[in-house]
A protein has these predicted regions:
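Aromatic-lined carbohydrate-binding surfaces of glycoside hydrolases
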Residues: 151-416, 470-480, 486, 492, ...
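N-terminal export signals
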Residues: 6-25
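Contiguous, structured surface segment used for ligand recognition
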Residues: 26-150
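Glycan-association/targeting regions that enable binding to alpha-glucans and other polysaccharides
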Residues: 685-818
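Secretory targeting signals
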Residues: 1-2
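Structured segments of extracytoplasmic/periplasmic soluble domains
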Residues: 53-60, 113-117, 181, 185, ...
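Carbohydrate-recognition beta-sandwich/jelly-roll modules
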Residues: 100-126, 173-190, 197, 469, ...
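Substrate-binding groove of N-acetylhexosamine-processing glycoside hydrolases
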Residues: 143, 333, 345, 349-708
């Protein structure tokens, strides 16, 4: 082993870029890269990304920085004048491939494009290469270079905060991993909406002081009440889920480690400020904003009644105008690096305006534009809203300055087409926001590439210059998110072609076509549960059903029940996914196919439990009517004969849903979803429905209590080890904490981070620190700049053997930028 100190003392490093790979495969002995451009952090990053990518793909074993070499493939990276912004071309002559780019950013884009054409996949959850590597180059023909320019000048993401499986639970390392992923996906804009409502927790990213009062500052944790969540200790989770959490509260350290409300706000702002600054270093523009016509509860309580009684409305009062300036000034003070300030129409107004067309006030938008002109003229204002906001576009277009950008979420959770109103904004920049996933199906896998394909084609036809994708989760959204990123450059990319490409990154060549077909069936064939029903409502919107709406209680069995025909298709689809996963012949392929199969598999018992809970609720409604009519005995008999058997049937279904999902989770977002499912599915189905039964039956029979206990018993399974977050860029001299989740490995297991320079033989090992239950942590960095590229993995050595992440001798490649 090499002493770990040989990997530290790296104070001059400016970045570390991550690439996951299987065990090394054979390739050419030497490949050369030469930078025919100015030596900068970004051009060095481009070279190291190309170096690590080619090795990870199995196309090279040794990549050297040299201008040429007889018989060795050579890549020349250059920046040239005369190309439009972000454009590049890749040409080949003999053994030499020349990359010519318009800028440093375009050079990075070109390298990522080149690697993707070889088989790499850049997604929200990081980078994947085909399980067995690749054996053939994919290069342009001599004299016929590849040329690329973006289909949209603005290509971004809008990660939505508010749940346990999203940006709300981020720590520093999560923001680092996220922005590095955006860079590799060739995206260039990050947007963020902040709820400042009285009905839900007021998010801590913004925290204004006004009229002598401050505001509540929260990030969603398992100790939070709101969005259908109730406070719950993670130690109370059944089925063994508690072992996957290090302490009683799961969430961002900014919230769970803070002493009080003010420290939550300060920690949150510091964390996001660090993340946004880092995004800027990578060339990603950023923006954040709020709903000007919605006030935090405490701020609203502090306002004078005379402001609310203003004849023209509160927005035109002196108090409202001073408050808006205070909110804008607070935003700019907290995040001076942002490029855009967003003002949002609130969600309630959007849905209310469907029934009654109420014009939106322009007062706040005009005032904010003037404020930015005076105090931050380089920052641009974006006005946005939910899908119904486009109903205001024509009037707003006439009344607002032309440099304000218009944006809106797709209507009906993105299942309606991009609004025609975007086409009536001649001369104005506009960005539709398609839904990469929707929250009424928040726990489900969602394959939406075909929907995004339609949205992007229509947005281009309406003259839109940009698009941002709204999402919450990462890895399970990548089948759609990677399409969105790719189609932002390739106008011809179809969902069908994309799924085939995505499948090749997950499965061996013999199984990739079957996987692609399954994903396409889920997308276009109604093969699994979906929010979209395929129907159109009388008012012309897409019909939708909510079976796991995480913005409320999710397990909302009272409102609806799954379609029986869909349940049959879903059962068959889950069996096909599972059968395909069983055919995997390497540990890496088993993990990737098993992840997708597990997500689809848990839908079956979940929907069965949902259906039984719906039937049980109907029994309880009838029993309640009997009780109100004075027939308590009849109510008791009905619940005992019809209700209790349904509960006994759904208990093992709830258990199966949790155990199936729990067995494949691999990311921090998955951990958050597991916490949500414990809080909403398990708590409601196992605890609340039991109390509902006891209202009529009193003490339940022993068999029912035994069934309840059996449903909650910790599940046994094979030992697992995974890194929920894999940050991919380090700043000079810093260290990032990585959590390691290791259920079933045993208390005496030896867990550590292994790391070495790429091409080196010996590994250095850093021991993990136990954080609580089955959760440990390791430190990544600082890294010695002279190594150029390192690779690392986490391992657990126990009585049952050694397991690792990545599995079977694989590694995460990390290219150092010095």
């Amino acid at each position: 082993m090499i002493d770990r100190r040989t990997l530290i003392r790296g104070g001059t490093a400016t970045g570390l870029a991550l690439l996951a790979s299987p065990a090394p495969a054979a390739g050419p002995s030497v490949v050369r890269i030469w930078r025919a451009c100015v030596d900068t952090p970004k051009t060095r990053l481009a070279m190291q990304e190309l170096r690590s990518g080619l090795v990870a793909l199995g196309l090279a074993r040794d990549v050297r920085e040299a201008p040429d070499g007889a018989g060795a493939p050579t890549f020349i990276l250059s920046i040239v004048a005369g190309l439009a912004s972000e454009t590049y071309e890749i040409a080949r002559s003999g053994d030499t491939v020349t990359v010519r780019a318009a800028s440093e950013q375009a050079l990075l884009h070109a390298v990522f494009d080149l690697l993707e054409r070889q088989g790499a996949l850049f997604g929200l959850d990081g980078t994947m290469v085909p399980p067995g590597g690749v054996r053939r180059w994919s290069l342009p023909e001599a004299g016929r270079p590849w040329r690329a320019e973006p289909a949209f000048a603005t290509r971004g993401l809008l990660p939505w905060p508010d749940f346990l499986n999203c940006i709300s639970v981020f720590n520093q390392e999560d923001f680092r991993a996220y922005f590095a992923a955006m860079l590799r996906m060739r995206l260039n804009l990050f947007g963020m909406h902040v709820y400042t409502d009285t009905l839900q927790p007021t998010e801590a990213y913004l925290s204004v002081r006004f009229a002598g009062a401050g505001q509540q500052a929260e990030l969603e944790t398992t100790a939070t009440r709101g969005w259908g969540y109730l406070p719950q200790r993670t130690s109370t989770y059944g089925m063994g889920s508690s072992e996957l959490f290090d302490r009683e509260t799961f969430g961002s350290d900014a919230a769970r480690l803070a002493a009080d409300n003010w420290e939550i706000a300060d920690r949150t702002a510091a964390m996001l400020r660090d993340g946004l600054s880092f995004a800027g270093d990578l060339g990603i523009r950023t923006g954040i904003g709020f709903e000007p016509y919605k006030l935090p509860a405490a701020i609203g309580d502090a306002l004078p009644p005379e402001a609310r009684s203003h004849p023209a409305g509160f927005a035109d009062s002196v108090t409202a105008k001073r408050l808006l300036e205070a909110r804008l000034a607070d935003l700019l003070e907290r995040y001076p690096m942002v490029d855009h300030v967003w003002l949002w129409e609130d969600e309630t107004s959007n849905w209310d305006s469907r029934a009654k067309d109420v014009p939106i006030s322009t007062t706040a938008f005009v005032q904010a534009h003037d404020f930015l002109r005076r105090h931050a003229p380089r920052k641009r204002l974006v006005v946005a809203g939910w899908g119904g906001f486009t109903r205001h576009f024509a009037r707003l277009h006439q009344n607002l300055p032309g440099d304000i950008i218009f944006s809106a979420l797709g209507d009906t959770l993105g299942w309606d087409p991009v609004a025609e109103a975007f086409g009536g904004l001649e001369g104005r920049e506009r960005w539709p926001i398609p839904w990469l996933e929707d929250d009424p199906s928040m726990w489900f896998p969602q394959f939406r590439a075909s929907r995004i394909e339609d949205d992007m084609r229509r947005a281009r036809s309406l003259g839109c210059q940009g698009m941002l994708g709204i999402h919450w989760r990462h890895r399970i959204v990548d089948p759609t998110a990677t399409y969105f990123a790719g189609a932002g450059w390739d106008r011809t990319l179809s969902a069908r072609t994309h799924y085939a490409r995505y499948a090749r990154s997950q499965a061996a060549p013999s199984r990739a076509p079957a996987l692609a077909g399954l994903m396409l069936d889920c997308d276009t064939g109604g093969a699994i549960a979906s929010t979209y029903t395929g129907a159109t409502t009388p008012d012309g919107h897409a019909g939708h059903v909510e079976l796991s709406a995480d913005y409320q209680e999710a397990f909302k069995y009272r409102e609806n029940t799954p379609d029986p025909a869909m349940l049959l298709r879903q059962r068959r689809t889950a069996a096909r996914f599972e059968a395909l996963a069983r055919l995997a012949d390497t540990a890496l392929e088993r993990e990737r196919l098993g992840y997708l199969a597990g997500f689809v598999k848990f839908l079956v018992p979940y929907c069965d439990a949902y259906r039984n809970a719906h039937a049980l609720d109907a029994v309880l409604v009838r029993a309640d009517a009997l009780r109100k009519a004075g027939d308590a005995q009849g109510a008791r008999r009905l619940v005992g004969e019809e209700g209790l058997p349904l509960w006994l049937e759904l208990l093992p279904q709830v258990r199966a849903a949790i155990v199936d999902f729990q067995s494949v989770i691999a990311t921090r977002h998955d951990l958050g979803q597991l916490a949500s499912m414990q809080n909403k599915l398990v708590r409601i189905a196992v605890e609340r429905l039991r109390l509902s039964l006891e209202e009529f039956l009193g003490d339940l029979p022993e068999e029912a209590l035994r069934a309840q206990q059996a449903a909650l018993v910790p599940a046994s399974g094979a030992p697992r080890l995974f890194l929920p977050t894999r940050p991919s860029i380090l700043r000079p001299g810093e260290t990032l904490r990585l959590f390691v989740v290791a259920p079933g490995v045993g208390a005496d297991a030896r867990i550590g981070l292994l790391h070495r320079g790429l091409g080196h033989t010996d590994w250095s090992r850093t021991a993990a620190r136990h954080e609580g239950r089955a959760v440990h942590s390791v430190a990544l960095g600082p890294v010695e700049p002279a190594l150029g590229v390192i690779e690392y993995r986490v391992e657990a050595e126990g009585r049952t053997g050694t397991i690792s992440d990545p599995p079977a001798g694989g590694a995460y490649h990390a290219a150092l930028l010095a």
